[in-house]
């Protein structure tokens, strides 16, 4: 089973999440950052091109053997699908069309969701915005592993399994920590997605649908692009609960690696986050940062000081506070 993790509890703190206060300080010093706020007019074309690429790929993978289909799903389709998940992340902040056109953002979210295979764009928005506002809250922030996860996967091999099973924890954890009734848009999202899936099976067979689903699942687990799930908020350095990564994988993930910058300024689209760092570099260069998402996965699994417990948590303060 391997070495047991050294932590036996989460890192409980009694301070506010750090991003709102740092945002205020940075804007006082660099008010020009406000000019970076707003939607990215090029985003919809990039996201749309990825969706089209996956749809065209379906006509190729339908004739592949199952072994080559899995290789294609891991090495190609899964990367695009993971990037589309991060497109959904951008859309959840209304960064595709701006806050004045919410339904345009939701519809693009439905479209970006199609190759992913599982309806998630509306549900993701519902929980993700709370992750920003209530970062670390024990009863609201569903990005934090449950106590059961932390206790079960507390060895080297256990952490390896946990990384492989990450997509399932991301799907089911919100239903345990902070269940919410489905909204009308979630139902529409589900109907649209299931209809798309059914059309794939009807016209092309089961293999293309399997290619999409397998790619989505594999690229959320033991995969280099999935390293951002762990790199963003797992405590690799005591006292720091958010980390940035500035490496080349940002090019295919809408700069999600600029995670301190994103949490400080969620109204800035991913394409402009490097400019935030350039302007306010003294705030970001001094914080711990990751240089490789693959190394993050390796260190998470092999380092006994890191594991599901390595998260900052706060006692519940309630949605009304």
From Swiss-Prot:
GO molecular function, one term: sphingolipid delta-4 desaturase activity
Catalytic activity: an N-acylsphinganine + 2 Fe(II)-[cytochrome b5] + O2 + 2 H(+) = an N-acylsphing-4-enine + 2 Fe(III)-[cytochrome b5] + 2 H2O; an N-acyleicosasphinganine + 2 Fe(II)-[cytochrome b5] + O2 + 2 H(+) = an N-acyleicosasphing-4-enine + 2 Fe(III)-[cytochrome b5] + 2 H2O
Membrane association type: Multi-pass membrane protein
Pathway named in the protein's UniProt entry: Sphingolipid metabolism
Keyword list, A-Z: Endoplasmic reticulum, Lipid metabolism, Membrane, Mitochondrion, Oxidoreductase, Transmembrane, Transmembrane helix
Keyword Transmembrane helix on entry: yes
Coiled-coil portions: none
EC number assigned by the record: 1.14.19.17
GO annotation terms (biological process): ceramide biosynthetic process; negative regulation of lipophagy
Superkingdom of origin: Eukaryota
Localization per Swiss-Prot or TrEMBL: Endoplasmic reticulum membrane; Membrane; Mitochondrion
Disruption of the gene: reported phenotype: Primary spermatocytes become mature in size but degenerate without initiating meiotic chromosome condensation in their nuclei. The mutation does not affect female fertility but leads to semi-lethality both in males and females during embryonic stages. Homozygous mutant spermatids show a misshapen Nebenkern, which varies in size and is associated with multiple nuclei.
Distribution of this protein across tissues and organs: Testes.
GO cellular component: endoplasmic reticulum; endoplasmic reticulum membrane; late endosome; mitochondrion
Residues spanning the membrane: 41-61, 68-88, 107-127, 157-177, 187-206, 208-230
Main location: endoplasmic reticulum
Function of the protein: Has sphingolipid-delta-4-desaturase activity. Converts sphinganine-containing sphingolipids (such as N-acylsphinganines or dihydroceramides) into sphingolipids containing the delta-4-desaturated sphingoid base (E)-sphing-4-enine (such as N-acylsphing-4-enines or ceramides), which are required for many different functions (structural functions as well as signaling). Required to initiate spermatid differentiation among other signals.
Similarity-based family: Belongs to the fatty acid desaturase type 1 family. DEGS subfamily.
Annotated protein name in UniProt: Sphingolipid delta(4)-desaturase DES1
């Amino acid at each position: 089973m391997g070495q047991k993790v050294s932590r036996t509890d989460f890192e409980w703190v009694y301070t506010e999440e750090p991003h709102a206060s740092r945002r205020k300080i940075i804007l006082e010093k660099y008010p020009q950052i406000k000019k970076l706020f707003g939607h990215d007019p090029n985003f919809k074309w990039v996201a749309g091109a990825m969706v089209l690429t996956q749809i065209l790929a379906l006509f190729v993978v339908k004739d592949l053997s199952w072994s080559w289909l899995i290789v294609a799903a891991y090495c190609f389709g899964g990367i695009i699908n993971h990037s589309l998940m991060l497109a959904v992340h951008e859309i959840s902040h209304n960064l595709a069309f701006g806050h004045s056109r919410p339904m345009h953002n939701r519809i693009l979210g439905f479209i970006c969701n199609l190759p992913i295979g599982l309806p998630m764009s509306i549900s993701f928005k519902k929980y993700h915005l709370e992750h920003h506002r209530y970062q670390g809250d024990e009863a609201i922030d569903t990005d934090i592993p449950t106590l059961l996860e932390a206790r079960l996967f507390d060895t080297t091999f256990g952490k390896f399994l946990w990384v492989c099973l990450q997509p399932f924890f991301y799907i089911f954890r919100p239903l345990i920590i902070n269940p919410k009734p489905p909204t009308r848009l979630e139902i529409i999202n589900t109907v649209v997605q299931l209809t798309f899936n059914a059309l794939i099976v009807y016209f092309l067979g089961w293999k293309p649908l399997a290619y999409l689903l397998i790619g989505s699942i594999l690229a959320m687990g033991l995969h280099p692009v999935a390293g951002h799930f762990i790199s963003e908020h797992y405590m690799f350095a005591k006292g720091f609960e958010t980390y940035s990564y500035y490496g080349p994988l940002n090019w295919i993930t809408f700069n999600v690696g600029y995670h301190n910058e994103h949490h400080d300024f969620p109204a800035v689209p991913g394409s402009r986050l490097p400019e935030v760092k350039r302007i306010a570099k003294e705030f970001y260069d001094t914080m711990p940062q990751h240089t490789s998402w693959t190394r993050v996965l390796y260190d998470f699994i092999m380092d006994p000081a890191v594991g599901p417990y390595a998260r900052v948590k706060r006692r519940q303060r309630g949605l009304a506070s």
